[in-house]
Amino acid sequence: MKTGIKKIKLHVKKNDDVVVIAGNDKGKSGKVLKVFPQKGRVIVEGVNIRKRHMRPTQTSPQGSIIEREFPIHASNVKKS
């Protein structure tokens, strides 16, 4: 029995220009920043932005809230 995760061949790769065709960000376009072939997901610039709460550290004792892109499923994007 095999163990591990199977890579999925995706139709997009890093630096491709894509348009979101499904979900809350439908109609938005951007550049692919990162691809996760094992999960079948991609990170698109300016799409699926969420707030991330950062703990206080020595460099930033106040802590912070940053906004960044999170992955979306590759089937929800198409090349433009």
UniProtKB/Swiss-Prot annotation:
PANTHER family: MITOCHONDRIAL RIBOSOMAL PROTEIN L24. Keywords: Ribonucleoprotein, Ribosomal protein, RNA-binding, rRNA-binding. Belongs to the universal ribosomal protein uL24 family. PROSITE patterns: RIBOSOMAL_L24. HAMAP family: Ribosomal_uL24_B. InterPro entries: KOW (IPR005824), Rib_uL2_dom2 (IPR014722), Ribosomal_uL24 (IPR003256), Ribosomal_uL24_CS (IPR005825), Ribosomal_uL24_KOW (IPR041988), Translation_prot_SH3-like_sf (IPR008991). This is Large ribosomal subunit protein uL24. It comes from Chlorobaculum parvum (strain DSM 263 / NCIMB 8327). The lineage of its organism: Bacteria, Pseudomonadati, Chlorobiota, Chlorobiia, Chlorobiales. Part of the 50S ribosomal subunit.
